[in-house]
């Protein structure tokens, strides 16, 4: 029997920013001056490093002195334990099913790795965090059982490696519609004590790429992410509720200048890749900080694998702490101010936190069987590969075979990278176009509101605010169009490289003696490209399904907002011969404020439709419907009353006289608004290619369907979503 309850409530949290200043080193004490002052544990002052300025320049405010305020500021004498005291509450939520992210940000040599990893006498935030988790699990007096697992990866030169595997290959990122960004093939180890995680942490750190530079004798050349997952479930009960909390502890590599490090060769290339990924992170921080002021700014997560991994921590379902590490030396002034500048912008970032609640059911056993079968298949393939390698090693023309195999491996790797790059570019372009679509929808509403306001009062403050907001949206659209042009150019270059690789394969097939093998390789790679491109469509479909679940939850809120309880709804449905697909509603009356919950598996059932209940009056209060990116207010018989409509994700307000999507005759006014979807059991609507959105532009997965109408004379509700018209009889249309 389906349960009816509200979805997990979301809380908005602001990214917490702490600044930690390390002491001067022995060499810095001889050649540098201390320029950092900490005031009241929340304010930091960076003094002007130039002491040669005269009095006139100082009184004319020609100084480089900078002042910043943060949640917490730690002087050079503070230990890692002092930092951890103020962020431990964030870590404790992981045991309750919440996500948390802690990352250290700063230039090379500023103390990031020391802060995150620490030493035996001064343990870092990583060590203190997993000790807290196991202490909380041990002290828990409930009957719940806990399962703790951890993984450890690094991002080196835009390639992901597993630090818990002795000889890890290249790992790829995958997007899961439920769990978000995941690393395919990453090893996750179950642990039962903090000492075991510490052992794994030491093993991973020994495999991490580090080099000695003039700026830092133990410079980290990669970004490292330690992820701890805590699953909490009731003991001995099948089908019980499961809470899944995740803690991500990130030690970033430091930005550096080639002129300061005097690097060359591989070290120089490593530094360039580090700076490129950190620049992508800085751009994401800028865009997220700008969203509260300028609205729908595109966030370029796909410009780097690091930013894709940190996506949840920066703007998704996570409570996040950023520890900015700085050096007090005067010759590090520019690095220090740059770090504090981005940390100051990060204070504006907001995340949306909710518990990760799941239920165990029969699908789990199916997945386990599939995994077991795949593991058996992988073992067989590894065995066959070892036999083939042995056969190659005993051939008389061993050197020639090795050269051919090396060439094939390089070609295979380049082809895979080309396909993955094209997927990321196409997804990024799709996301950017969706952002611009919403911008243009808001621009249309603003133009309508400005036109109405000009008729009333041309000099009002409301008109000025609307005009200013309109200019901000136009700037966002222009910036996004420029970014889109850059993505299209990159896609063209990627396609050109794809053709080059195909030509190389065809040439080798025609010239090499082993033509059959190369022909098979060519066909395999071409099929691999096709399969990878189909994954894009699958990811889009997953997003469609997720959006549809949210729409159905909103529809239940609308139904209960009319004043009907579950018993009344069941009676109305029975009179019209309407039932829920699967099984009927229970007779007991739930809280009218709670919509039904749906299983995370399956095709978004159950669906319902009801006739308009004439006997039930509509609630006189406004019904605010949270849907996607907007909140719409429906007021019965007040269609011409000016209403303040609010775009919640933009924190912007503007006047609209026709917020209701229906006119006096009961006909819908679409105005680009997405509407709920209902269907009858006799003619259920297909969910194929359905996506809540607007009719202003078509999406890549939009599809035309024939128009259908209700036959019994009731008022019609036309639903247009991404050029997909659907007609159905609902009680919402008669309100």
Swiss-Prot record:
Q: Tell me the keywords, alphabetical order.
A: ATP-binding, Coiled coil, Microtubule, Motor protein, Nucleotide-binding
Q: Which residues form a coiled coil?
A: 354-395, 424-454
Q: Which Pfam families match?
A: Kinesin (PF00225)
Q: What is this protein called?
A: Kinesin-like protein KIN-8B
Report the GO terms under cellular component. Answer: cytoplasm; kinesin complex; microtubule
Query: InterPro entries this protein is in?
Result: Kinesin-like_fam (IPR027640), Kinesin_motor_CS (IPR019821), Kinesin_motor_dom (IPR001752), Kinesin_motor_dom_sf (IPR036961), P-loop_NTPase (IPR027417)
Q: Where does ATP bind?
A: 106-113
Name its GO BP terms in alphabetical order.
microtubule-based movement
Span list, region Disordered: 664-684
The UniProt GO MF terms for this protein read: ATP binding; ATP hydrolysis activity; microtubule binding; microtubule motor activity
Family to which this protein belongs: Belongs to the TRAFAC class myosin-kinesin ATPase superfamily. Kinesin family. KIN-8 subfamily.
Q: Which residues form the Kinesin motor domain?
A: 14-349
| Keyword Nucleotide-binding assigned | yes
In its keyword annotation, does this UniProt entry include Coiled coil? yes
């Amino acid at each position: 029997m389906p349960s009816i309850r509200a979805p997990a409530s979301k809380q908005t949290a602001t990214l917490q920013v702490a600044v930690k200043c390390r002491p001067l080193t022995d060499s810095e004490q001889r050649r540098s001056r201390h320029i950092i002052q900490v005031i009241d544990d929340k304010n930091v002052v960076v003094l002007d490093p130039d002491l040669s300025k005269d009095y006139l320049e100082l009184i004319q405010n020609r100084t480089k002195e900078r002042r910043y305020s943060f949640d917490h500021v730690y002087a050079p004498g503070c230990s890692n334990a002092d930092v951890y005291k103020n962020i431990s509450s964030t870590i404790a939520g992981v045991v309750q099913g919440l996500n948390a992210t802690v990352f250290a940000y700063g230039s090379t040599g500023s103390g990031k790795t020391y802060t995150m990893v620490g030493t035996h006498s001064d343990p870092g935030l990583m060590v203190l965090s997993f000790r807290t988790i196991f202490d909380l699990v041990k002290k828990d007096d409930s009957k719940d059982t806990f399962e703790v697992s951890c993984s450890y990866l690094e991002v080196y030169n835009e390639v992901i490696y597993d630090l818990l595997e002795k000889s890890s290959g290249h790992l790829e990122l995958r997007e899961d519609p439920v769990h978000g960004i995941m690393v395919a093939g990453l090893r996750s180890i179950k642990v039962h004590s903090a000492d075991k995680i510490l052992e794994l942490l030491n093993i991973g750190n020994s495999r991490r790429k580090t080099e000695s530079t003039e700026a830092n004798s133990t410079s980290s050349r990669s970004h490292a992410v330690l992820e701890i997952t805590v699953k909490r479930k009731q003991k001995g009960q099948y089908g019980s509720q499961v809470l899944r909390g995740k803690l991500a502890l990130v030690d970033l590599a430091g930005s550096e200048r080639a002129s300061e490090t005097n690097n060359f060769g591989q070290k120089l290339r490593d530094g360039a890749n580090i700076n490129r990924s950190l620049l992508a992170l800085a751009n994401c921080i800028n865009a997220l900080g700008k969203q509260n002021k300028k609205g729908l700014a595109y966030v370029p997560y796909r410009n780097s694998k690091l930013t894709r991994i940190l996506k949840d921590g920066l703007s998704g379902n996570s409570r996040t702490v950023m520890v900015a590490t700085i050096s007090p030396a005067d010759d590090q002034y520019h690095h220090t101010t740059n770090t504090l500048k981005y940390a100051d912008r990060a204070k504006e970032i907001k995340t949306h936190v909710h518990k990760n609640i799941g239920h165990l059911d029969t699908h789990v056993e199916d997945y386990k069987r599939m995994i077991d079968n795949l593991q058996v298949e992988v073992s067989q393939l590894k065995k066959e590969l070892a036999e083939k390698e042995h056969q190659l090693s005993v051939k008389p023309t061993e050197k020639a075979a090795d050269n051919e195999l090396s060439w094939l491996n390089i070609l295979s790797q380049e082809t895979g990278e080309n396909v993955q790059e094209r997927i990321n570019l196409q997804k990024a372009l799709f996301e950017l176009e969706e952002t611009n679509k919403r911008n243009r929808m808001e621009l249309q509403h603003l133009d309508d509101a400005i036109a109405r306001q000009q008729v009333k009062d041309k000099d009002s403050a409301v008109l000025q605010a609307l005009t200013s907001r309109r200019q901000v949206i136009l700037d966002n659209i222009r910036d996004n169009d420029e970014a889109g042009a850059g993505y299209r150019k990159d896609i063209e270059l990627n396609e050109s490289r794809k053709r080059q690789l195909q030509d190389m394969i065809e040439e080798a097939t025609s010239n090499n003696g082993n033509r059959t093998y190369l022909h098979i390789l060519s066909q395999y790679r071409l099929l691999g490209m096709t399969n990878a491109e189909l994954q894009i469509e699958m990811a889009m479909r997953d997003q469609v399904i997720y959006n549809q679940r949210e729409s159905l939850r909103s529809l239940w809120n609308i139904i209960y907002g009319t004043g009907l309880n579950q018993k009344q709804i069941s009676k109305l449905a029975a009179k019209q011969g309407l039932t829920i697909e699967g099984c009927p509603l229970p007779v007991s009356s739930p809280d009218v404020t709670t919509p039904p919950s749906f299983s995370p598996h399956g095709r978004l059932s159950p669906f319902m439709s009801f006739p308009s209940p004439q006997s039930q009056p509509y609630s006189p209060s406004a019904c605010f419907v949270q849907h996607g990116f907007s909140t719409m207010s429906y007021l019965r018989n007040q269609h011409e009353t000016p209403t303040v409509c609010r775009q919640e994700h933009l924190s912007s307000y503007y006047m609209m006289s026709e917020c209701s999507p229906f006119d006096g005759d009961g006909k819908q006014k679409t105005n680009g608004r997405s509407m709920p979807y209902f269907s009858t059991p006799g003619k259920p609507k297909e969910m194929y290619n359905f996506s809540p959105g607007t009719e202003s532009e078509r999406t890549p997965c939009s599809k035309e369907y024939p128009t259908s109408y209700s036959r019994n004379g009731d008022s019609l509700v036309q639903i247009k979503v991404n050029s997909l018209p659907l007609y159905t009889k609902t009680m919402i249309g008669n309100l």
